[in-house]
């Protein structure tokens, strides 16, 4: 019966759900980074990872953060706290809820309900508008996580921010005879079912992304109902939902009552067996060759449709009472082994790539590849390897060896968290670089503030005396726009940066691979001496953050900046005999001995704000005030910069938590976050030598990645099985 539909009736109005009114617009943030005055917080009142007095746990309301802009006022005289108000009297018995109604959840009061029913919960003044059960359904959360993992494994090339995957049926894109339940995964028929005009369908929430390459979903027949007139398939947006899938143009379906396939026509073609209650029907869309096949109970039924158009939605249709089906878009393992089918097509695509012809006229291709490799080694400062590779391939190194070593010195300082020394060394070797790039300088100094919080910057590591490659004395009052990490002779006034107005620090998706990926176990050296550092800083609000004992550190000598102890390609100290970059020296072993002595204490010092020193905290607060002033001056001279504003706000937010490392913004303290800063500085130095800020090899990788994204947007499904990472061995 479903194979002989009537002529398409006029489009009937589909059932639409009324959208709730939009929430009130959020308050626009004020210009600049403004920290509110801190409330009174007793020592030790904030648990680890909780805000140190900041409202809501995410802002900058902590007392420590406020000190960046407001010096601590003298403590007010102690006064006795007023007694708490007496509790309100219990309500009279007549105001109690009816005994027949369920009690309202905490935070809700019983309000007037429907006639004859129990009262409905109403929000009490001051209570949250969230769900009455604050913890939510943990089982549902776990199911959502499992769905996310399964979809990521099946469709790794899909960017769901750009092209979301279908996850359920759409309550807004269905005919009125369709009912949805169980998180919009179960479909049941609620019409009359007397004629084919009573057919009804529903589409999924999103179309199938081309980046899937191969997409698959399954439908289980819970009940075939009266006649089993059910259709499973695909349809484009706008296709009439008062029809079974397959009856109209750009609609495709496999029907259960007769086993026929319907390809944009009311006349079906014999295709497969019928299906009924208990059967599981799968639909696989191959976006590489634009075909579709079905499965029944895990067995393929062969190709059903060819030459499919792009942007099709999973669709299911019902026609008679009692019909109920459940969809599986990846919420559960599939009956059919779709992953084996995907592996088969991945092999085919990779074989096509391997067979692609490459013209090699007199070794031009090989020579080009060698130049790309050589420039990559030079860009990242692999001196000895670059020299050896150039000799073996009869090439010349474009950059002088001394220049490569200078860049390497600076990169090592940045990757070690010694930002103050990195800024100082950069200014000594490239005097005008940071003047022409004020936003880059700001980025470096924000990173220096983060390293101060982390206790790794030289300003807080060396408290026994003069900082290496740093200023002779730390300013007591804020000196606008001069770097606390630089000697006075190298101080930089922001007005001298006006010539670089509009310049920005250069970031790209490939700059983060400056020296590979840094592991979380980044090597950090600490030395100690017998000199005890103390401070008379009176900041009672920080008592819950700091440990009672002071950090004991030693002065680093000036040759620290020239050390070659660590190869930071992975953030872990490595030694080898590969020339200048990867070499070791006597100083290496001295630093290793120092680390051995501090093995027990260093782990504790790293978990304290500024290494646990009050003097270091005082320096950090002064530095933060100067950083805030520099941000305001940059905004006046160069205009608003949203990235700079967010960067500074995130850095200051670290002080709103008693344990910044385990806070929502604690990822900033991860050594891997030094990589993009290091890459931006390295690229800026290369530009001063008229060298490309990115190596050609990275640009080629970027172009290939962008091409794959363009293929996905153009509906070419083979991009799903041609990732750049497959060829990076």
UniProtKB/Swiss-Prot annotation:
<dbReference type="InterPro" id="IPR003877">
    <property type="entry name" value="SPRY_dom"/>
</dbReference>
<keyword id="KW-1003">Cell membrane</keyword>
<dbReference type="InterPro" id="IPR013144">
    <property type="entry name" value="CRA_dom"/>
</dbReference>
<feature type="domain" description="CTLH">
    <location>
        <begin position="403"/>
        <end position="460"/>
    </location>
</feature>
<dbReference type="GO" id="GO:0007020">
    <property type="term" value="P:microtubule nucleation"/>
</dbReference>
<keyword id="KW-0007">Acetylation</keyword>
<keyword id="KW-0472">Membrane</keyword>
<dbReference type="GO" id="GO:0065003">
    <property type="term" value="P:protein-containing complex assembly"/>
</dbReference>
<feature type="region of interest" description="Interaction with FMR1">
    <location>
        <begin position="615"/>
        <end position="729"/>
    </location>
</feature>
<dbReference type="GO" id="GO:0005829">
    <property type="term" value="C:cytosol"/>
</dbReference>
<dbReference type="InterPro" id="IPR035782">
    <property type="entry name" value="SPRY_RanBP9/10"/>
</dbReference>
<feature type="region of interest" description="Disordered">
    <location>
        <begin position="1"/>
        <end position="137"/>
    </location>
</feature>
<keyword id="KW-0597">Phosphoprotein</keyword>
<dbReference type="InterPro" id="IPR024964">
    <property type="entry name" value="CTLH/CRA"/>
</dbReference>
<dbReference type="GO" id="GO:0016604">
    <property type="term" value="C:nuclear body"/>
</dbReference>
<dbReference type="GO" id="GO:0005886">
    <property type="term" value="C:plasma membrane"/>
</dbReference>
<feature type="region of interest" description="Disordered">
    <location>
        <begin position="461"/>
        <end position="489"/>
    </location>
</feature>
<feature type="compositionally biased region" description="Gly residues">
    <location>
        <begin position="50"/>
        <end position="60"/>
    </location>
</feature>
<feature type="modified residue" description="Phosphoserine">
    <location>
        <position position="487"/>
    </location>
</feature>
<dbReference type="GO" id="GO:1902993">
    <property type="term" value="P:positive regulation of amyloid precursor protein catabolic process"/>
</dbReference>
<feature type="region of interest" description="Interaction with CALB1">
    <location>
        <begin position="401"/>
        <end position="407"/>
    </location>
</feature>
<keyword id="KW-0832">Ubl conjugation</keyword>
<dbReference type="GO" id="GO:0031267">
    <property type="term" value="F:small GTPase binding"/>
</dbReference>
<comment type="subunit">
    <text>Part of a complex consisting of RANBP9, MKLN1 and GID8. Identified in the CTLH complex that contains GID4, RANBP9 and/or RANBP10, MKLN1, MAEA, RMND5A (or alternatively its paralog RMND5B), GID8, ARMC8, WDR26 and YPEL5. Within this complex, MAEA, RMND5A (or alternatively its paralog RMND5B), GID8, WDR26, and RANBP9 and/or RANBP10 form the catalytic core, while GID4, MKLN1, ARMC8 and YPEL5 have ancillary roles. Interacts with GTP-bound Ran, AR, CDC2L1/p110C, CALB1, S100A7, USP11, MKLN1, SOS1 or SOS2, GID8, and FMR1. Interacts with the Dyrk kinases HIPK2, DYRK1A, and DYRK1B.</text>
</comment>
<dbReference type="GO" id="GO:0007010">
    <property type="term" value="P:cytoskeleton organization"/>
</dbReference>
<feature type="compositionally biased region" description="Pro residues">
    <location>
        <begin position="70"/>
        <end position="93"/>
    </location>
</feature>
<dbReference type="Pfam" id="PF10607">
    <property type="entry name" value="CTLH"/>
</dbReference>
<dbReference type="GO" id="GO:0005634">
    <property type="term" value="C:nucleus"/>
</dbReference>
<protein>
    <recommendedName>
        <fullName>Ran-binding protein 9</fullName>
    </recommendedName>
</protein>
<dbReference type="GO" id="GO:0070373">
    <property type="term" value="P:negative regulation of ERK1 and ERK2 cascade"/>
</dbReference>
<feature type="domain" description="LisH">
    <location>
        <begin position="365"/>
        <end position="397"/>
    </location>
</feature>
<dbReference type="GO" id="GO:0005737">
    <property type="term" value="C:cytoplasm"/>
</dbReference>
<dbReference type="GO" id="GO:0000151">
    <property type="term" value="C:ubiquitin ligase complex"/>
</dbReference>
<feature type="compositionally biased region" description="Low complexity">
    <location>
        <begin position="27"/>
        <end position="49"/>
    </location>
</feature>
<feature type="compositionally biased region" description="Low complexity">
    <location>
        <begin position="473"/>
        <end position="489"/>
    </location>
</feature>
<dbReference type="InterPro" id="IPR006594">
    <property type="entry name" value="LisH"/>
</dbReference>
<keyword id="KW-0539">Nucleus</keyword>
<dbReference type="InterPro" id="IPR013320">
    <property type="entry name" value="ConA-like_dom_sf"/>
</dbReference>
<dbReference type="InterPro" id="IPR043136">
    <property type="entry name" value="B30.2/SPRY_sf"/>
</dbReference>
<feature type="domain" description="B30.2/SPRY">
    <location>
        <begin position="147"/>
        <end position="334"/>
    </location>
</feature>
<dbReference type="InterPro" id="IPR006595">
    <property type="entry name" value="CTLH_C"/>
</dbReference>
<dbReference type="Pfam" id="PF08513">
    <property type="entry name" value="LisH"/>
</dbReference>
